[in-house]
């Protein structure tokens, strides 16, 4: 029997294509409302993919403080800060109410894409009739790019800004590992508490893939091109799927020891019970079935649970032909006919923010005892032998697994247990 301290969830925050804040987010999930739409924050007419999961009506001045920090905050940082603020408010944590030296931050982040207009003048100054003259870049970058530009795009900035603003003077770390960043960050946050290095840790992830540079660079990969019907583009495990859908978003989770939560009188939302990770890259790219299986088995072992105790899986569901087949076979091999849903069918692949948003969705399903459906699942694919939830259904067992993976071969799983 394990004697380690249980780690619980006491606060959630989310900025997503289906809502800003947990109430709006949950309402959209239950209303089965897609957040995939034609892009509006940039002119998509010249882009090969003109839609995605975009966060609309986000006003950073409502959340970011001090306001002057906005000058050195990219959109990824802004939405991360907002999600963190929401989570801490829900958990009842504020500066002065806890020991700052026992308060940590571990966040997942992508390599943050710069906006083209930020480097346009410097780039143009280097153009010649023969192409790009690299010898001019040193001078042009010094004169035509904002001096603090780099601070807007370092992946550790979300954790830094959050730590400074909320007086979190304990362990502070950033994980940059593609789509599994949030999972790895959450695992590290739990270990900090279990090792006794912190009482409370804010964890989460942030990312955007509806960025023009990202879209252009990745549009030649297996990406859905349903520009005429974007709300039907995200179709994980479905027979008619034609590629993944990009999105943007951030989420944050407040974790603390059960002892600390009870001492504060905090409401416990769920338990962060186990984590598993593995690596295996297929010869033709993508993660291997064995790696996904290993991550699932590892998370269950860490939680001290058996496969028959899992109530549902929040699958990664990339939406490509091969990736979905591999993930489906792995789930079937370890967990049998367990119900499977894909939250990202609502908002797309959010990069390093996706796992954190999936965790928020999963905690909500555990709280409401209801599994939300996978949108656009109309026709099953025999090559994906999983029990996909196409219509909302009651949750029979209060245990969930949240899966993630990267095209480079990383696989990760988080095990969450609902609170009675």
Question: Locations of the language-model features?
Answer:
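Condensing-enzyme catalytic core mediating Claisen C-C bond formation in acyl metabolism
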Residues: 6-10, 33-38, 229-305, 311-312, ...
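Cysteine-centered functional microenvironments
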Residues: 8, 12-13, 63-73, 137-149, ...
């Amino acid at each position: 029997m394990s004697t380690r301290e249980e780690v619980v969830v006491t606060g959630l925050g989310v900025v997503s294509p289906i809502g800003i804040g947990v109430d709006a987010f949950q309402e959209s999930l239950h209303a089965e409302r897609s957040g995939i739409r034609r892009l509006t924050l940039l002119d998509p007419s010249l882009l090969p993919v003109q839609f995605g999961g975009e966060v609309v009506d986000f006003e950073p001045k409502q959340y970011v403080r001090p306001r002057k920090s906005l000058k050195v905050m990219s959109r990824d940082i802004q939405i991360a800060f907002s999600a963190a603020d929401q989570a801490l408010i829900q958990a009842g944590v504020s500066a002065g109410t806890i020991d700052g030296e026992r308060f940590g931050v571990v966040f997942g982040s992508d390599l943050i894409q710069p906006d083209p207009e930020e480097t346009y003048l410097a780039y143009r100054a280097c153009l010649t009739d023969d192409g790009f003259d690299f010898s001019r870049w040193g001078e042009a970058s010094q004169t035509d790019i904002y001096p603090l530009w780099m601070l807007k795009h370092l992946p550790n900035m979300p954790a830094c800004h959050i730590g400074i603003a909320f007086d979190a003077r304990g362990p502070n770390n950033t994980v940059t590992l593609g789509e599994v960043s949030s999972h790895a960050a959450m695992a590290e946050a739990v270990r900090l508490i279990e090792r006794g290095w912190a009482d409370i840790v804010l964890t989460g992830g942030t990312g955007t893939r509806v960025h023009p540079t990202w879209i252009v660079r990745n549009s030649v990969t297996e990406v859905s091109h349903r520009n005429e019907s974007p709300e039907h583009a995200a179709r994980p495990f479905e027979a008619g799927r034609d590629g993944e859908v990009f999105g943007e978003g951030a989420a944050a989770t407040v974790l603390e020891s059960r002892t600390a939560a009870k001492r504060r009188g905090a409401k416990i939302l769920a338990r962060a019970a186990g984590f598993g990770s593995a690596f295996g890259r297929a010869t033709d790219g993508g993660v291997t079935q064995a790696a996904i299986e290993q991550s699932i088995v590892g998370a269950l072992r860490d939680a001290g649970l058996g496969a028959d105790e899992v109530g549902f899986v929040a699958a990664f569901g990339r939406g490509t032909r091969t990736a979905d087949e591999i993930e489906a076979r792995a789930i079937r091999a370890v967990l049998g006919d367990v119900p499977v849903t894909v939250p990202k069918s609502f908002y797309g692949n959010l990069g390093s923010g996706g796992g954190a948003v999936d965790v928020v969705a999963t905690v909500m399903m555990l709280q409401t005892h209801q599994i939300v459906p996978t949108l656009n699942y109309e026709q099953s694919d025999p090559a994906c032998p999983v029990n996909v939830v196409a219509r909302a259904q009651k949750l029979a067992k209060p245990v969930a697994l949240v899966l993630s993976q990267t095209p480079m071969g990383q696989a990760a799983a988080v095990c969450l247990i609902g609170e009675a």
